[in-house]
Amino acid sequence: MARLQDQYREKIAPSLIEKFGYTSPMQVPRITKITLNMGVSEAVADKKVMDNAVSDMTKIAGQKPVVTKAKKAIAGFKIREDLPIGCMVTLRGVQMYEFLDRFVTVALPRVRDFRGISGRAFDGRGNYNIGVKEQIIFPEIEYDKVDALRGLNISITTTAKTDEECKALLTAFRFPFKN
């Protein structure tokens, strides 16, 4: 079992019950999934770019991503229908907690000029989104073998009903919020 999963069961859940006054342990917010999404617009011109993006995402997430394809053609962007334009991976269970642990303790401190993550990236329904500008903050990616710096979006989906509950949950997981 993952370290953060144990921490959630033993410390975080009881503290959230005390803070918000839940009557049932099933009301306590928890993280259900983490989705990593990488848009690769350069894949339109060069197919090898997509292979590199998929290999980077596999190293970061620990499982093979799904290649996302264009739903409809957009002439202005030179995109045809069913053309590969990105990749995504959904993490749940132990892999999710392992990724979260690596992200908070190892990857975030490696961001240049890091002063904390924004406290305004909640969606109003208890979910949180983080944009990462370059994939080299993850220790699994070797700097010398990177062909191009690519960003990715990390969506953390929780069972929290409000942004306040979600922020309390993520703060308990030691997310370094600004202010």
Curated annotation (Swiss-Prot):
SUPFAM superfamilies (alphabetical): RL5-like (SSF55282)
Family membership: Belongs to the universal ribosomal protein uL5 family.
Entries under InterPro entries matching the protein: Ribosomal_uL5, Ribosomal_uL5_bac-type, Ribosomal_uL5_C, Ribosomal_uL5_CS, Ribosomal_uL5_dom_sf, Ribosomal_uL5_N
Gene Ontology CC, one term: ribonucleoprotein complex
Function: This is one of the proteins that bind and probably mediate the attachment of the 5S RNA into the large ribosomal subunit, where it forms part of the central protuberance. In the 70S ribosome it contacts protein S13 of the 30S subunit (bridge B1b), connecting the 2 subunits; this bridge is implicated in subunit movement. Contacts the P site tRNA; the 5S rRNA and some of its associated proteins might help stabilize positioning of ribosome-bound tRNAs.
A biological-process GO annotation: translation
Any one GO molecular-function label of the UniProt entry: structural constituent of ribosome
Protein name per UniProt: Large ribosomal subunit protein uL5
Taxon lineage: Bacteria, Pseudomonadati, Pseudomonadota, Betaproteobacteria, Burkholderiales
Entry keyword set: Ribonucleoprotein, Ribosomal protein, RNA-binding, rRNA-binding, tRNA-binding
Stretch forming the signal peptide: none
Keyword rRNA-binding: yes
